[in-house]
Amino acid sequence: KKHVKVDLKELTVAPYYGCQLNRPWGDIDDLQHPVMMDRLIETLGAGVATNYSAKTICCGASHMMPYEKSCLPQVRRIVNDALAKEARAISTVCPLCQFNVDAAQSGLDLPDMPVLYFTQLLGLAFGLGEKDLQLKKLLVPFKIAI
């Protein structure tokens, strides 16, 4: 907490655990209702999207390429739930989750929902800039207007 330099209180984040963060099952956090990332986001000073029910559903993982039509409803639910909770961004630690949820939005006709790596959120709180955090590499843009 002592390293936080930027006030993120205006930023509400939907913590997206996906299906892999809790593996090995239950050893790190509660399998059905994890809170580890929620608490870390709160420690950074950002708001947490409460009752974000999609936070543990699978994004489609490696099935997104061969079975895209089956996976898109899952991404739709992940994004719609974050939008319903008034989140301005989704945060995840999984590279495949980040890519799937970020890239799949272009075909879903939904309002844009940026998907940040948790480390990018850390960087924002610690005062790193857009260039340092490679925010322009995200497919759904995220602006640092905090």
Language model feature labels by segment:
Residues K1-I146:
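Iron-sulfur cluster-binding electron-transfer modules in prokaryotic oxidoreductases
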